[in-house]
């Protein structure tokens, strides 16, 4: 298993990129707007960060697997996805930065094409900047935050 999260922001806007997405989509506002958990990772934590398209291509040279591995679709589709099991053996955590998320969410060019003719999956399904913690021992401390934030859907009047 793993733990998913989004970076706590202290910029006066939304508390996290996840809550920005929740508000923009009007997605379960009551559930996600009143409480959060904050944690700090150990300085020794091994973190795999994707901040650019080049970072993603470099990562996928070692940690890629076919999206439709052992499937009737494997010969039709050449998409590659991250091999999370393999990545989790070498890293404590994975971080997809906000910049990388937006750049590779729905790319309009061929930036995710590989030299072998395959293509890397985009990050559309991630919804926002994301952290995935594989090794919970890399958490130095954590705390519950009662947010006094009223998140309003963009669709409300």
Give residue spans per PLM region.
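Extended catalytic/binding region for NAD+/ADP-ribose chemistry, centered on the ART fold
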Residues: 1-34, 38-40
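Active-site and NAD+-binding cores of ADP-ribose-processing enzymes
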Residues: 24-157
